[in-house]
């Protein structure tokens, strides 16, 4: 996390022309998530300070800029298609396909620019998450940011598509930003009913999830923007819905609203196993990041994505140089 704070400080220095004081190490709360996970694997008698010695604190992926509700309704068959192991996938229903016409100007690098550094960064992020999944309960991953325009939706979409193309697992992308839904536009897909209609009891859950064939994932869109989004998300139906979805899918990637100034994210975060914070160099201010981190359960923070990074590594030059 220290690298992200360093990057933000450099950006603010460039904008203001003055050198800002460095942040205290106490602000690096993302480290607590890894410390907590490591501590659970150690003996209760072992001091936390010893455990900290074996933890890699800077797992950062730099991505180039780029009233009461009705009970949840689920119907249909409990027998699904054949999975990658040749065995029948139990309790996985058939979902309607939704046609995508992905615009050429899209930023879905994992689909249209697979050989670029940005796409490789998302593959690295996927590998990292799969490694964490072997160590702890990690199926529902919430992607958020501190403020709008930091790239959280693009990160969520690219991550879901990357997992869908690199694994035999079933990946669901949930559009949790019900106030400002945008994912259908990213995929060039028709705007259809989804999460909100299901929470209102107007639509069956199985008919609210769609299969996006080309990306190889499933998609639960936000649906029509509700009049009372916060009340809708607070419904107990949402928890029941997430439990049902978890029984069907191997990964659930949730595109959440920004942490500030809405309460929506705190509701969705309670249902997530892990949280990824997206930070955009040149846009995010350190004070906003500090406040955003304070609003999230540190035990669920599994890492961060630095978007629009200008920091170059040896791998960057490998992808930048044309083959000789």
Language-model segments: residues:
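P-loop NTP-binding module
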Residues: 2-324
């Amino acid at each position: 996390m220290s690298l992200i704070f360093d990057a933000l400080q450099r950006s603010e220095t460039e904008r203001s022309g003055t050198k800002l004081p460095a942040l205290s190490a106490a602000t690096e709360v993302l480290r607590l998530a890894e410390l907590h996970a490591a501590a659970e694997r150690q003996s209760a008698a072992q001091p936390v300070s010893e455990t900290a010695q074996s933890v890699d604190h800077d797992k950062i992926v730099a991505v180039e800029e780029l009233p009461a509700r009705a009970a949840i309704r689920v119907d249909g068959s409990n027998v699904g298609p054949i999975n990658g192991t040749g065995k029948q996938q139990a309790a996985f229903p058939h979902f309607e396909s939704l046609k995508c016409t992905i615009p050429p100007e899209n930023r879905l690098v994992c689909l249209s620019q697979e050989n670029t550094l940005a796409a490789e960064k998302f593959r690295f992020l996927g590998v990292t998450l799969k490694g964490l999944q072997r160590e702890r309960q990690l199926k529902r991953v919430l992607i958020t940011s501190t403020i709008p325009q930091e790239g959280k939706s693009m990160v969520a979409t690219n991550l879901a598509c990357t997992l869908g193309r690199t694994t035999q697992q079933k990946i669901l992308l949930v559009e949790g930003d019900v106030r400002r839904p945008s994912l259908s536009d990213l995929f060039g897909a028709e705007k259809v009913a989804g999460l909100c209609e299901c929470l209102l009891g107007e639509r069956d859950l199985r008919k609210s999830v769609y299969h996006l064939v080309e990306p190889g994932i499933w998609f639960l869109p936000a649906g029509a923007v509700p009049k009372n989004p916060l009340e809708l998300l607070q419904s107990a139906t949402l928890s029941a819905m997430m439990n049902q979805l978890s029984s069907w899918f191997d990964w659930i990637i949730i595109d959440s609203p920004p942490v500030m100034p809405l309460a929506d994210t705190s509701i969705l975060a309670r249902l997530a196993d892990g949280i990824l914070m997206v930070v955009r160099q040149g846009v995010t201010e350190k004070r906003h990041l500090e406040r955003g981190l304070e609003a999230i359960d540190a035990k669920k923070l599994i890492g961060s994505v630095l978007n629009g990074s200008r920091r170059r590594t040896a791998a960057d030059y490998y992808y930048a140089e044309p083959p000789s």
